[in-house]
């Protein structure tokens, strides 16, 4: 969470876009976060937008939320109208609160449906497949490009990922071309 003065300093320094995910729906949020409320998160996003930041705002699927929670989260994201919507799929990591989370419901079909739903519900935003891409879409990754605008590569906040060269090769083999937004390898 940023104070207005901190956000203003970042904007004045040249920062244009900020990622501030909702992570889940309003009703499920207390199950995953105890440091601040959903409304504080929404208000922080509104403040950042009022300063002129482009927003990257998405969520994490597979933390125990219901299908209705996914829809509710996407409805709130649609209201925010971010430039970019990263959809992450839970990667349970040993030593974290969600390490033992049951992810058996995160089938390829379900995960693809979530991305399609994001595309339909937030049509003006770039839909991005982020964490979990290599796990949940193994063998069908090229299919993602029929639904999403971009994918993440080379790792995530808490887990490694497919390297950029392998990702670019996969994109090329699928008959697409790719651009790298960040030169950090």
Task: Enumerate the language-model features and the residues they cover.
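A short acidic, helix-capping loop that chelates divalent metal ions and anchors anionic groups
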Residues: 26-32, 94-99
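Auxiliary Fe-S-binding modules of radical SAM enzymes
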Residues: 78-185
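Alpha-helix N-cap and loop-to-helix initiation/capping positions
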Residues: 33-40, 65-72, 102-110
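Distinct, well-ordered alpha-helical segments
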Residues: 5-14, 140-141
């Amino acid at each position: 969470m940023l104070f207005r003065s901190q956000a203003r300093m970042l904007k004045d320094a040249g920062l244009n876009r900020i990622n501030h995910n909702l992570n889940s729906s309003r009703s499920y949020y207390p199950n995953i976060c105890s440091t601040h409320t959903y409304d504080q998160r929404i208000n922080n996003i509104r403040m950042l937008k009022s300063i002129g930041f482009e927003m990257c705002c998405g969520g994490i699927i597979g933390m125990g939320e219901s299908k209705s929670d996914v829809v509710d989260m996407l409805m709130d994201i649609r209201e925010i109208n971010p430039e970019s919507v990263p959809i992450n799929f839970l990667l349970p990591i040993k030593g974290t609160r969600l390490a033992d989370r049951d992810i058996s419901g995160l089938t390829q079909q379900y995960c693809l449906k979530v991305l399609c739903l994001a595309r339909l519900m937030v049509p003006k935003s770039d839909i991005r497949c982020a964490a979990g891409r290599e796990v949940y879409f193994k063998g069908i990754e090229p299919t993602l490009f029929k639904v999403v605008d971009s994918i993440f590569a080379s790792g995530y906040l808490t887990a490694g990922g497919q390297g950029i060269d392998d990702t670019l090769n996969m994109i090329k083999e699928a008959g697409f071309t790719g651009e790298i937004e960040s030169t950090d390898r």
